[in-house]
Amino acid sequence: MKKRRGVASYVVDLLQTDPHAQPQAPYIRPSSLAKGCLLYVAFELQGRPKPPFDARVGRILSVGTDSHRRLQRVLERDCIGQEVFFEVADYRIHGLCDGVLYIAPRKADEESMTGFWALEFKTAAAAEFDKVKAAGVPKEEHVRQAQIYLWGLGEYYRGTIPLKGAIIYYENRDTLDHLAYEVYPDPDAIADLLARVKAMLDGLAEGRLPDDVLPPEHWAHAYCPYLDICEPGQKAMAWQRVQPKSIPDQVLADIIAKRIVAKKGAEAMTGSKKKGGRSLADLAKELEWE
């Protein structure tokens, strides 16, 4: 019998193969690379063990997964694909983009909106969400992750999906409040990141770990799962411990709020307004929170 050839044969063969049963070299995940620490990425590629998540973190991740699925269901008729895979073997990077949105001309308010957009969904605690909202820009690592998707999808699909940019959609996991930002391709930024990846891969091939790490003041050192084996991270934490302490924003906000509430309660009890103190409206105006 003549062997079948062509696309139909390819699909038949593909469906007889379990991709998870095939031996695979470790690859870099976009979310890991987006952290900006190439030593962290190197540890992952080497398969260094991480401590298990505690139950609370597991529940938080589960909430994020549920939010992703809900948002994807809402957009299923507006996306050409969800969990869109890409792989770039030269840099050992692969991943799944949350979705590729298509805005049809008849649905666009402006002509510039029409076209294909990569989607990235992020769930955040209320305090983190408020910071992003107040800043008016997405977090640096989320911008970097969006750039990786734009580049990776372009490489893997060879430009057949002409992505105009990416949309980073934030959702407050406590209130379901939301906001979104547009991110456009930045060839210079992605070229710099890929050069760092190439240097890291070349070093690993020669048995060397990279010295491309986050600055000592970066908050991520305290949450790194590799801190026990990471000398730069341990030095960074030692440096942070001797720096002058400042009151965390959330703690300061709680203190101010409690004092204002106590003052209002005292006024209600005595029937007279206490002198000297500022109202919440005065404070908000002074701190430009309005």
Please annotate each region the language model reported.
Residues 44-45, 122, 171, 227:
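Structured loops at beta-to-helix junctions and adjacent beta-edge loops in soluble globular domains
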Residues 51, 133, 238-239:
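Short amphipathic alpha-helical leader/targeting segments
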Residues 27-30, 136, 265, 279:
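Short, solvent-exposed coil/turn linker segments
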